[in-house]
Structure formats: structure tokens, C-alpha cells
From Swiss-Prot:
It is found in: Mitochondrion. This is Stomatin-like protein stl-1. Gene3D superfamilies: Band 7 domain. The keyword Metal-binding does not apply. Belongs to the band 7/mec-2 family. Transmembrane segments: none annotated. Pfam families: Band_7, Band_7_C. PANTHER family: STOMATIN-LIKE PROTEIN 2, MITOCHONDRIAL (PTHR43327:SF10). One of its GO terms (biological process) is mitochondrion organization. Keywords: Mitochondrion. Widely expressed in most tissues, including body wall muscles, intestinal epithelia, and pharynx and head neurons. Induction: Induced by anoxia. Induced by paraquat, a chemical causing production of reactive oxygen species (ROS).
Length: 324
């Protein structure tokens, strides 16, 4: 019993002597790990163990056992994604515009061994790499591209960081440019450019409105002219139809009159009546000539009405003989 108590006391002393806080060089230490026999590794952490000063193994989350005298927890790596603020720095674009930029870098450890032995201070190294990469990428483009294609710029920075930080066991998930400052003169020039662009758009909209109004007026005038011409055409057609119908009616009336005259001539005494009518019209025609101031050649026997009637009858007889 005494021997057992003595062994327990020695073991307790040994455990107390091995629970000294560990000086972890990584700044992503979740808590102070202790060199004990029984160790509980939290989730999303990796403990790097050295045995007699040489890398031994990496403790996975859960229950782990170590030998406190010869084993030592050297590094505690946080496997969760973390955000690092990138300090403000200067950069010059390809068109010689000086900018002041800062950002946020999101990264995680994917290889605890490389993160522990590949670089002394991973966070500091990645921060410096992000700054130099951002200056390099900004120097390849002009100011307008920096504003228009910021997402592409972020992607290029992430690609360059991952390419350089692969031996460190660190992966850059994304990079975001947070703030961007430029000289006051450049800001004033950009403001003037914005105002000019607004005025240009306003002028374009106004000219388009004037053009649309002119087109609408022209379309209205065109339709009005078409309607007016159609109205004139319809009026002329109606007048022509009226005149044609009048001519047809006159011709039909004339034909009916001639037909009746022909029927009358076939009756007894019709020829004498027709001759008398012709003689009357003949004499009347000469009477009308006397009313006008025209120069005409008259027959010599104009003063003899009987001879004029005889001439009229002779004309009628000659016409009648021709028909026969």
C-alpha cells in the first residue's frame, strides 16, 4: 500500500512538471497546449508533435497520448478559415495614377506540417505577399480597369498568392479590396467626367425626343396628305361618275327623242311636219345670227322668207333621199 502511494505521488509530480505552457511560434494558436500524457485535441485544430527535437506526428482531433519527457507539442495550427486585414499601401497604375488601397484576405491552413516548418510566421508572410502582389497587379492595368474589373483584380491576386504560398501549406480562399483612395485632382477630374457623361446622356435623350416628335409629326402630315389626296380623288371620281351618268342620260334621252321622231315620220303627214320643223329652225338660226356681232356670209335672198323656207325644205328633202 505504501509502495502504491509512493508511485502515485511520483506520477503526479511528473505530470505537474510536464504541464508547462507551450511557447507556440504560430500566431494562430487557439489556446496554450500542455505536454501531458492524455491530450484532447479540439475540432478543426492540428497539434504538431516533436520527439526529442524532431518532427514526430500530428495529433488529430480527439483523444491522444504522449510521453511528456520525450514528446513535445511544438505547434498548434488552426484549420478554420480566418480573415486578415491587409494594411493600406500605395500602388501606381499603368497610367501613372497613385492609389492607396487596403483589403481583407481570407485563408486557411491545409497542411499543418508545411505551415509549421515551411515558413517562420505564416500570417506575416502572407500579408507581405498580398501587399506585393496587389501592387504588382495594379501596376498592370489602368485606373478605369481598376474600377470596372475589381473582381478580376481580386481573382488575379488570389491566384498569385496561392501560387507563391503553396510551399507554406496555406491556401488563400479569396481577397477583397476594401477601400481605394486617389489624389484629389483625380477625383475632381472623375467627377467632371461623370457630369459630362450625364450631360451627354441628357442631350442624347433630348435629341431622341425631338427626333421622335419630328417623326411623329411627319407621320401625321403624311397620313393627313394621304387622306386629303384620297378625298380629292374620291371627289373627282364622284364628279366624273356624275358627268358620265349625265352624258348617258342625255344620250338616252336623245335616242328616245330620235326614236319617237322616227316613229312620227312614218305616220301620215309626218314628213310634212318634219319639213316644217326644219324650215322653222332654219329661219330661227338666221334670226339668231343677226343678234350677234359676228361677220358671216349670208345668202343673197335673205330678205325673201319664202325662198328661205324653200331652201330649208330642199335641205330636208335631200337628207331624206340620202337615207333612202
Amino acid at each position: 500500500m505504501a509502495l502504491t502511494n509512493r508511485l502515485l505521488m511520483n506520477s503526479s509530480a511528473l505530470l505537474r512538471s510536464s504541464t508547462l505552457p507551450l511557447a507556440v511560434t504560430s500566431s494562430r494558436q487557439a489556446h496554450a497546449a500542455h505536454n501531458t500524457v492524455i491530450n484532447f485535441v479540439p475540432q478543426q485544430e492540428a497539434w504538431v508533435v516533436e520527439r526529442m527535437g524532431k518532427f514526430y506526428k500530428i495529433l488529430e482531433p480527439g483523444l491522444n497520448f504522449l510521453l511528456p519527457i520525450i514528446d513535445k507539442i511544438k505547434f498548434v495550427q488552426n484549420l478554420r478559415e480566418i480573415a486578415i486585414e491587409i494594411p493600406e499601401q500605395g500602388a501606381i497604375t499603368i497610367d501613372n495614377v497613385q492609389l492607396r488601397l487596403d483589403g481583407v484576405l481570407y485563408l486557411r491552413v491545409f497542411d499543418p506540417y508545411k505551415a509549421s516548418y515551411g515558413v517562420d510566421d505564416p500570417e506575416f508572410a502572407v500579408t507581405q505577399l498580398a501587399q506585393t502582389t496587389m501592387r504588382s497587379e495594379v501596376g498592370k492595368i489602368n485606373l478605369d480597369t481598376v474600377f470596372k474589373e475589381r473582381e478580376l483584380l481580386n481573382e488575379n491576386i488570389v491566384f498569385a498568392i496561392n501560387k507563391a504560398s503553396a510551399p507554406w501549406g496555406i491556401q488563400c480562399m479569396r481577397y477583397e479590396i476594401r477601400d481605394m483612395q486617389m489624389p484629389s485632382k483625380i477625383q475632381e477630374a472623375m467627377q467632371m467626367q461623370v457630369e459630362a457623361e450625364r450631360k451627354k446622356r441628357a442631350a442624347i435623350l433630348e435629341s431622341e425626343g425631338i427626333r421622335e416628335a419630328a417623326i411623329n409629326r411627319a407621320e401625321g402630315d403624311k397620313k393627313s396628305a394621304i387622306l386629303a389626296s384620297e378625298a380629292v380623288q374620291a371627289e373627282r371620281i364622284n364628279v366624273a361618275k356624275g358627268e358620265a351618268e349625265a352624258v348617258i342620260l342625255k344620250a338616252e334621252s336623245r335616242a328616245k327623242a330620235i326614236e319617237r321622231i322616227a316613229l312620227a315620220l312614218e305616220k301620215d303627214g309626218g314628213a310634212n311636219a318634219a319639213g316644217l320643223t326644219v324650215a322653222e329652225q332654219y329661219v330661227g338660226a338666221f334670226g339668231n345670227l343677226a343678234k350677234e356681232s359676228n361677220t358671216v356670209v349670208l345668202p343673197a335672198n335673205l330678205s325673201d322668207p319664202g325662198s328661205m323656207v324653200s331652201q330649208a325644205l330642199a335641205v330636208y328633202d335631200s337628207l331624206s333621199n340620202k337615207k333612202k
